[in-house]
Structure formats: structure tokens, C-alpha cells
Swiss-Prot record:
Keywords: Cell membrane, Disulfide bond, Glycoprotein, Ion channel, Ion transport, Membrane, Metal-binding, Potassium, Potassium channel, Potassium transport, Transmembrane, Transmembrane helix, Transport, Voltage-gated channel. Residues 412-444 are annotated as: Disordered. The gene is Kcnk10. Residues 154-180, 263-294 dip into the membrane without crossing it. It comes from the Eukaryota. Activated by stimuli such as mechanical stretch, acidic pH and polyunsaturated free fatty acids. Residues 276-281 are annotated as: Selectivity filter 2. This is Potassium channel subfamily K member 10. Expressed mainly in the cerebellum, spleen, and testis. One of its GO terms (biological process) is cellular response to arachidonate. Glycans are attached at N144, N147. K(+) 2 binds at I168, G169, V277, G278. One of its GO terms (cellular component) is plasma membrane.
Length: 538
């Protein structure tokens, strides 16, 4: 249960962002050693009222955080699973014992009725019901009730009032009258908040005491150059051990001695009481067969008060741990995602840059290899052609060179251009000797251009060549065409956009052609145009 308070209590929370600013003793909060990491949060000694103080401080500062629905549903599912698991375990442990008790009671009732024939089963059931009602009213049906102490004497009534405002509610005694029930309602409404203020104050004092002790322990470990995280863990363990010794172990030993319980029953009662569960199956000072001292029950209630403050501090500390762990987990997950995204971007950029460099290098190497292969093929072709020409006779070599380099084309063109003048100057004997004057004029009139006539003359000349020369010419002609096709395919595969390499290849090709005696196409076309102009003038 949460208790409202007027002012935020002094505390040092695990989470620096959520912690309420409060003035704490300087001894309890020594300066943490800066080691390059985030400061480790300090343990808090707080009670259930701390939750209300934190909520008030957050609402005043406008920084109140609301839990998301997904988180609420997840926690609800976890709680339901936890409840189902607990129910299954309790049923497996307690149901066999309950069945055995039922069988035992049934056998004892049957044996009693068999031994006491004068008692009817209805009378026995009525007696048992009266005993249960008396027990529920707080009167023990065991023994002589006139000699035992009353459940509503001053000590017992004080203890009952303490169980009401502490919300423990053992249930061993309860008001039976209407006036008592009405007063219990009003008493709980005003007494529970009042006890909450008292519990918060005691929690502050316990926090101060334990804070000073923890600060001394941290000072000792800090001199030994122990890491801050280890110091926090050690101080937490010492805090829990000290509380367990003071509020659990020592009271359990006392209850075992006074109440006659076993060690397990004593520890069970202590934990159930300080966690405000209060089943009521074991109650200190509830045994009618024991004569308790008058101060026993008030002392038990004072132990409950201080023990509740300690357990509230422990529960609050556990809640702070879980909250800090969840926030740290979220921050670590966010950092991991950010690092992963940054690493992915860097790897992608490096991969793209590497691929671009490799593509450029491979492209350059392919282009250079294509150029080198083209030059080697041309050089090999020229060497083979020169070797073949060396094997021919001088006459065939001159004819083949004239056909290959285009010199015959120029000489035949000059003869054609000069043919009309020769026909005019020379006599009829020479015309009859050659017998070609009229045929050449007909050829000029028929084709109408010197270029067509030149091509025709070349074809006629090729027909008159010997067969061995024609075969050699065709072989080298096909070889040249194959070389040109291979060069074109290589250029298409390379997809070269570098104009300098193309110009270099073209210059090398033109130079090789000029060395072999071949006339460039531009020069050939220009020569044809000049010859046409001279022919028109004539």
C-alpha cells in the first residue's frame, strides 16, 4: 500500500534522472571516484512512501513518465504465470495433507460415535460448530476458558490495533459486534495514513544509519583501490546481511524460545509478518496455554514497526534495481543498434569504393590488354606478309605491293586522266596498236566517273594475275578482314569511353599503314577530288 506524505523524503536513488532532489547528509553520500564511466547509483533506504514522493516530485517537475500499455500487458502476463505456477505448486504440496486430515477427522468422528452410543451424530455436529464459532470469536475451545487470558484485554487489544494500521491483519481475532466493526473501519481509514508517515520517518532514520555505515565501508575499500561497482555490490550485500541478522534471525530465535515453534515456523512467521501477508496461522502471543508478560505484545508490535521499515526499504531497493536494469538494458540495446547501423554504413561505403576502384582498374587493364593484343596482331600480320613477299619473285612482289598499297590505283587513275590527251597527240598507228582508244572512251562515257573506272581496271588487272599471286592476295586480304573484326569485337567488349586510348590506337594503325606503303583514306579521297578537278579543267 502507498502512503502519501507532505514533503519528499531524503533518499539517494539508483536512477539519477528520476531521483527527487533532497538534502542528504554529506557523510552518507561520499563523492564517487571518477573512472571515465557513468557514476554508479547509490543504494536507497526508503519505504513505500518513497513511491508517492517520487510521483509528486515528477508531477511538479512535469517529468512524470507513464508506463506503456505493452509493458503493462507484459507484466500482467508474467504475474498471471507466476500465480498459476504458485497455485500448482501449493496444490501439489498441500492437497495430499488436506485429504489425509479429512480422512482422519472422519475416522475419529465414527470412532467417537461408536464408543459413545448415547451421542447422536447431529449432537456431535452441533458441538463442533459451536467450537468453531468460539474460535472465530477469539475464544479458544481448548481447555478451561475461565482460567486463560482474554483476547480483548489491554495487551491483546493494543496488538490488534497495531495489526489494523499496519495492514497485516492476522485474522486470529476480529470484532464481532456491529459497533466494533464500524469503529474498525474508521480506525483503519485514519490510522493507516498516520502509520505511513511514521514508517517514512523511521525509514529515513534507518537510511541515515545504514548510509553512514555503508560510507565507512566504501571508504575502507576505496583506499584499497577497489572498483566502484564492487564497492556497491559489497555494500549492498552487507546492508542485506545486517538487516537479516537484526530483523529476521534474532527475532526468529526469540520466538522459537518463547512460543515453542520450530526454526522453520519461526522464520515463516517473521517473513509473513514483515511482508504484511499475515495469514494468522502463527501469531506471537496467541497461545492460550502460555502466560505471556505484559510487555511482550507491545514489544512485538515495535519490532513489527521497525521491521516493516526495513523490508519496505529492501522492496524499494529491489524496485530501483529492476528499473535501473531495464533502463540500462534499453540504453545498451540502443547503443548496439546505433553501432550496428554505423558499422553497416561504413562497410557499405567501403564496399562501394572498393568495387568502384576495382572496376576502374579492371577496365584500364582490359583496355590496355586489348590495345596490346591489337598491336601484336598487326605486327605479326606485317611480319608474315613481309616474309611471304620475300618468297615471291621481284615481278610478282611489285604487282602484289601495287595492289595492296593502292599505287596501282593511282597509276591507273593517272593513265585514265591522261588518256584523252594521249589519244589526241598520238597517231592512228598507236591507236590501232593498242586498240583501246574507242573502248576507253566508251568506258568513260558508260561509267561517268573516274572512281568507277578505277575499280573496273583493278578488277580486270586482278583477273589477269597468275593464280598463285591471286591466292596469296586473297589470303592476306581475308587475314586483314579477320583482324579488323576481332579488333571491333574487342572494342565492344571493353566499352571504352577513353578517347585518348582510341586516338592512340588509331595513330598506331595509321603509322603502321604508312610504313607498309598504304595510303590513308583521307589522302585517297583528296587525291580523287583533285584529279576530278583537273579533268574538268582539261
Amino acid at each position: 500500500m502507498k502512503f502519501p506524505i507532505e514533503t519528499p523524503r531524503k533518499q539517494v536513488n539508483w536512477d539519477p534522472k528520476v531521483a527527487v532532489p533532497a538534502a542528504a547528509p554529506p557523510v552518507c553520500q561520499p563523492k564517487s571516484a571518477t573512472n571515465g564511466h557513468h557514476p554508479v547509483p547509490r543504494l536507497s533506504i526508503s519505504s513505500r512512501a518513497t513511491v508517492v514522493a517520487r510521483m509528486e516530485g515528477a508531477s511538479q517537475g512535469g517529468l512524470q513518465t507513464v508506463m506503456k500499455w505493452k509493458t503493462v500487458v507484459a507484466i500482467f502476463v508474467v504475474v498471471v504465470v507466476y500465480l498459476v505456477t504458485g497455485g500448482l505448486v501449493f496444490r501439489a504440496l498441500e492437497q495430499p495433507f488436506e485429504s489425509s486430515q479429512k480422512n482422519t477427522i472422519a475416522l475419529e468422528k465414527a470412532e467417537f460415535l461408536r464408543d459413545h452410543i448415547c451421542v447422536s451424530p447431529q449432537e456431535l455436529e452441533t458441538l463442533i460448530q459451536h467450537a468453531l464459532d468460539a474460535d472465530n470469536a477469539g475464544v479458544s475451545p481448548v481447555g478451561n476458558s475461565s482460567n486463560s487470558s482474554s483476547h480483548w484485554d489491554l495487551g491483546s487489544a493494543f496488538f490488534f490495533a497495531g495489526t489494523v494500521i499496519t495492514t497485516i491483519g492476522y485474522g486470529n481475532i476480529a470484532p464481532s459486534t456491529e459497533g466494533g466493526k464500524i469503529f474498525c473501519i474508521l480506525y483503519a481509514i485514519f490510522g493507516i495514513p498516520l502509520f505511513g508517515f511514521l514508517l517514512a520517518g523511521i525509514g529515513d532514520q534507518l537510511g541515515t544509519i545504514f548510509g553512514k555505515s555503508i560510507a565507512r565501508v566504501e571508504k575502507v575499500f576505496r583506499k584499497k583501490q577497489v572498483s566502484q561497482t564492487k564497492i556497491r555490490v559489497i555494500s549492498t550485500i552487507l546492508f542485506i546481511l545486517a538487516g537479516c541478522i537484526v530483523f529476521v534471525t534474532i527475532p526468529a530465535v526469540i520466538f522459537k524460545y518463547i512460543e515453542g515453534w520450530t526454526a522453520l515456523e519461526s522464520i515463516y512467521f517473521v517473513v509473513v509478518t514483515l511482508t504484511t501477508v499475515g495469514f494468522g496461522d502463527f501469531v506471537a502471543g496467541g497461545n492460550a496455554g502460555i502466560n505471556y508478560r505484559e510487555w511482550y505484545k507491545p514489544l512485538v508490535w515495535f519490532w513489527i514497526l521497525v521491521g516493516l521499515a526495513y523490508f519496505a526499504a529492501v522492496l524499494s531497493m529491489i524496485g530501483d534495481w529492476l528499473r535501473v536494469l531495464s533502463k540500462k538494458t534499453k540504453e545498451e540495446v540502443g547503443e548496439i543498434k546505433a553501432h550496428a547501423a554505423e558499422w553497416k554504413a561504413n562497410v557499405t561505403a567501403e564496399f562501394r569504393e572498393t568495387r568502384r576502384r576495382l572496376s576502374v582498374e579492371i577496365h584500364d587493364k582490359l583496355q590496355r590488354a586489348a590495345t596490346i593484343r591489337s598491336m601484336e596482331r598487326r605486327r605479326l600480320g606485317l611480319d608474315q606478309r613481309a616474309h611471304s613477299l620475300d618468297m615471291l619473285s621481284p615481278e610478282k612482289r611489285s604487282v602484289f605491293a601495287a595492289l595492296d598499297t593502292g599505287r596501282f590505283k593511282a597509276s591507273s587513275q593517272e593513265s585514265i586522266n591522261n588518256r584523252p590527251n594521249n589519244l589526241r597527240l598520238k597517231g592512228p598507228e598507236q591507236l590501232n596498236k593498242h586498240g583501246q582508244g574507242a573502248s576507253e572512251d566508251n568506258i568513260i562515257n558508260k561509267f561517268g566517273s573516274t572512281s568507277k573506272l578505277t575499280k573496273r581496271k583493278n578488277k580486270d588487272l586482278k583477273k589477269t594475275l597468275p593464280e598463285d599471286v591471286q591466292k596469296i592476295y586473297k589470303t592476306f586480304r581475308n587475314y586483314s578482314l579477320d583482324e579488323e573484326k576481332k579488333e571491333d569485337e574487342t572494342e565492344k567488349m571493353c566499352n571504352s569511353d577513353n578517347s585518348s586510348t582510341a586516338m592512340l590506337t588509331e595513330c598506331i594503325q595509321q603509322q603502321a599503314e604508312m610504313e607498309n606503303g598504304m595510303v590513308p583514306m583521307d589522302t585517297k579521297d583528296q587525291g580523287l577530288e583533285n584529279n576530278s578537278l583537273l579533268e574538268d579543267r582539261n
